Structures are given as C-alpha cells and as structure tokens.
C-alpha cells in the first residue's frame, strides 16, 4: 500500500471516529451536564446500564472536575466533530491540521486524569464516588479499555498531523 493509500486509510479511521463520537457525546456523555428532561428514558436507562455494567463511577456520580471536562466536550469538541468528520471522510483537507492538533492535545490532556483515576483511586475511601465502582484490577482495566480509544486515536491524530508530509504547513509567499 502506497503513501496516498495509507493516508486515506488513516483519514477514514479518523472520519469514522469523529462520526461515531457525535451520538456518544450527545446521548451518553452530556447527560451529566444537560437537564435530565432532554433525554428519553431509553437513553437514561442505557447510561445507567453502562455505568452499572462497567462500574464507571464518573458517569454514575460525576465529580465537578469531570463535569468540567464534559462541559468542554459540549462547547468545544461537539461542534468540531462534524467538521472533522467532513474533513477526514472527504480527505485532502489541509485546513483541518491546526484544529485537529488542538483537539488531539486537549482530548489527551483530559484523558490523563480520567485514566489515572480509574487506575490509582482508592474508591473504597473516596467519599466523592458513590454507587458501583471498580474494585478489582480486572474491573479497572476493563473500564480503562472503554476510555483508552479516546486517548489513543487523538494520539494517532496528533502524530498524523505533525508527521504526515501531506499535512505539513507550507508558507506561501507572493512572488515579486
């Protein structure tokens, strides 16, 4: 597979990632920050099932710091998702480079405390986490595996935008 074909495969991966992120954000993540009445009971039940099944304490009883991340997802990331979906599925949209770098760095930065919480938090002593929470290493790793793509794909995006010769910035100068 040549360089253009490889680039298109990565662009398709990124386009599908951003497309899939729209319903996940709207119907799951934002339930923690938007009024309950906006969501049909089916979506509320889906979130309850997920949080119980995967013992996700952040979506059962979201702490303030996590809600701040979700607010950023609502205000900054959600409007970017359709733009990025278009750019990557269409392909060859060099203008997406800077916004994609900003998105990837922002998203990876928010995932570090989330994944660290899942890995290192002593939930038995943490008063801020009620409800079910991961107790065993296996439960913690399962929960991390749910969130890990939201760290790994932005990392791939960042490397792709920084290293791809196609997306590198070239200064255009007027000829005299």
Curated annotation (Swiss-Prot):
Membrane topology label: Multi-pass membrane protein
Per its UniProt record, what InterPro entries does this chain match? EXPERA, Sigma-2_receptor-like, Sigma2_recept
Q: Which residues lie on this side of the membrane: Lumenal?
A: 31-68, 121-140
The disulfides recorded in the entry are none
Query: Where is this protein localized, as stated in its record?
Result: Rough endoplasmic reticulum membrane; Nucleus membrane
Please tell me one Gene Ontology term that the record gives under cellular component: lysosome
Tell me the ranges covered by the EXPERA domain, including all copies.
10-158
**What residues correspond to the site Important for 20(S)-OHC binding and stereoselectivity?**
150
Q: What's any GO biological process attached to this entry?
A: positive regulation of lipoprotein transport
Q: Which residues lie on this side of the membrane: Cytoplasmic?
A: 1-9, 90-99, 162-176
Q: Where is this motif: ER retention motif?
A: 172-176
Q: Which GO terms describe its molecular function?
A: cholesterol binding; oxysterol binding
> Which controlled-vocabulary keywords does the entry list?
Endoplasmic reticulum, Membrane, Nucleus, Transmembrane, Transmembrane helix
Q: Which Pfam families match?
A: EBP
Site (Likely important for receptor folding) residue list: 56
Residues that bind cholesterol = 75, 77
Provide the transmembrane region boundaries: 10-30, 69-89, 100-120, 141-161
> What is the recorded function of this protein according to its Swiss-Prot or TrEMBL entry?
Sigma-2 receptor which contributes to ameliorate dysfunctional cellular processes and slow degenerative progression by regulating cell functions including cholesterol biosynthesis/trafficking, membrane trafficking, autophagy, lipid membrane-bound protein trafficking, and receptor stabilization at the cell surface. Forms a ternary complex with PGRMC1 receptor and low density lipoprotein receptor/LDLR at the plasma membrane, which increases LDLR-mediated LDL cholesterol internalization.
What is stated about domains? The EXPERA domain doesn't possess any sterol isomerase catalytic activity. The four transmembrane helices are all kinked owing to the presence of proline residues in each, creating a ligand-binding cavity near the center of the protein.
Task: Share any extra remarks.
Answer: Sigma receptors are classified into two subtypes (Sigma-1 and Sigma-2) based on their different pharmacological profile. Sigma-2 receptors are identified by radioligand-binding studies as a binding site with high affinity for di-o-tolylguanidine (DTG) and haloperidol.
Q: What is the similarity comment for this entry? A: Belongs to the TMEM97/sigma-2 receptor family.
Q: What is this protein called?
A: Sigma intracellular receptor 2
